[in-house]
Curated annotation (Swiss-Prot):
The gene is HD16. GO terms for cellular component: cytoplasm; nucleus. Its EC number is 2.7.11.1. CDD domains: STKc_CK1. It comes from Oryza sativa subsp. japonica (Rice). Disruption phenotype: Early flowering. Enhanced response to gibberellin (GA). This is Casein kinase 1-like protein HD16. Keywords: ATP-binding, Cytoplasm, Flowering, Gibberellin signaling pathway, Growth regulation, Kinase, Nucleotide-binding, Nucleus, Serine/threonine-protein kinase, Transferase. Residues 24-37 have a biased composition (Low complexity).
Amino acid sequence: MPELRGGVWRARLRSKKVYDVQDADPAASPVSPAPRGRTGRRGGAAAGRGNKTVAEGGGRKALKPRGKGCRAVDLCKDQPCKDLPEVIARKAVTGKAQEDLGLNKVADRAANLMMDGESGDKFAAAEDESTTTPVPERVQVGNSPEYITDRKLGKGGFGQVYVGRRVSGGGSRTGPDAQEVALKFEHRSSKGCNYGPPYEWQVYHTLNGCYGIPSVHYKGRLGDYYILVMDMLGPSLWDVWNSVGQAMSAHMVACIAVEAISILEKLHSKGFVHGDVKPENFLLGHPGSVDEKKLFLIDLGLASRWKEASSGQHVDYDQRPDVFRGTIRYASVHAHLGRTGSRRDDLESLAYTLIFLIRGRLPWQGYQGDNKSFLVCKKKMATSPELLCCFCPAPFKHFLEMVTNMKFDEEPNYPKLISLFDGLIEGPASRPIRIDGALKVGQKRGRMVVNLDDDEQPKKKVRLGSPATQWISVYNARRPMKQRYHYNVADSRLHQHIEKGNEDGLYISCVSSSANFWALIMDAGTGFCSQVYELSQVFLHKDWIMEQWEKNYYITAIAGATNGSSLVVMSKGTPYTQQSYKVSESFPYKWINKKWKEGFHVTSMATAGNRWGVVMSRNAGYSHQVVELDFLYPSEGIHRRWETGYRITSTAATPDQAAFILSIPKRKPMDETQETLRTSSFPSNHVKEKWSKNLYIASICYGRTVC
């Protein structure tokens, strides 16, 4: 029964793991021969020939889209995606399905520029540099002095920076009266200027006077450009790293660490996260000035709020896997996966920055191609802190462990993070970087002793460097009913089990595969009145599926095996009125988002090796859906979705990733209880226990759960 909490009814939601993990080693699994095409009762099809075109069947007038779906911001290229056919069916009224060779192909066009190179690797909401409008030779904005535009200092995702020399007057090195300033130009056609001045202006205005953030003295528009007049600064940490032989001492990097943490603490206290922490965005003060050893954090073009300005509450969690903001080399894993930015992400990027400055290289450098972000994220998840920091002093490993284990809305313990590096920092005379901010944080600690081991409960590590795969089973509360499972089913025995279940009034509700053997869940609560299935040597046999669509069957369960074969189950008695599916070499989030906008919802998913198959249907009974995609079981994301009313309705996993579709049903069930379980073997020992609590398997898959 639901529990009453805080004045509202909340369902019982549990995620349980059985700690009998086995290593992921698909190559060691027994491989059965690729099956010949087989058709279950009431079906009928030849062996599959593979999907070579996109096809659409004629049918009834499409329903109006239901649900608002998720709005995707097309900021960067997809994860690796070799698009395979999309197939759409409409329930036939007359005639055969007509092929449309044009055919709803999804154009996955990247909207960013990629700044490729060992120091950049940046995907961002970048401006279109196709404009050839020269920057003004002379600049005067607002009540500023007049400046002559001199040499170019650099170019980023949101603009370009030049030296500005004052035409007359000015005698100081910094401040509004400086002889030299930095002029940042952003073209009015830049994506950041669609609605007027750049968003960065608003951030600088809010952060005015914030420790470690350079001052903006004047701003305004001149011709086609929005212009910021800022303090001139010195070399970046990237420049310094290059000048000292591409390796910094642990002492120097420790000084950088504590001061950078202090700067981020001040920035975060204003409600913002930076979003692009890296060596190129940390600059020292102007050479010869009093600030030449002071650290500054620049480029707020990707800054975002972690705290709502009006309410002061933490922003809501979300994940949009097609959105990436930052620089690939230093971005947090959560940024790669499209999760809403929060304070933990800046700190994870700082950890990679510090390790890079000491080691001179990160293990994920060198990847190229459209799937670069995917490969880098996969490598980050697979690299344990022990391995990544094997040539670094222990404090850097401890720092990385702490920040990569933080929750989405967790407040960082900045004093504790700074205190990690106390033993590496020498006296004031030998410090290459001023650590004024860190010292102030230390003064706040006062006489308190920060115990690094005992002041809080130890957290479970999320990145072990030992990938593993498991069964993931999802259980929903139902009225008592008959349910049956079969696992380790060979191709030759599949028909026998299904026939026996049909004779007992059971229909297939979900299917899965592991090591080229099948798992079947059959129950009496599907509501189906007829069912057909096909075991094919290809992954989702288009011709057979379209043939069944013509007979008013709809896909209700799919599974794929490592050897590329698939099991497709189609049923009558569903509420669906239209259906579409896609096979892709990567998780097809952009296609899913497109279909959401057309009123479809995900109703089945499967994988075959590293290929994904996703089925979407109209009139599925959901008002909204979201995706949780990760290189491990996304426990935090699932629990956050549960708390906001979502329930898991589809699951699938490859040896690399696990994906979960969570939905809000239009009709709220009497009992919303949902539980998940992860086991190294099929959960036969646990299912009966669940049945005794009226919890029944709703979805099951086998794949990556641990990194």
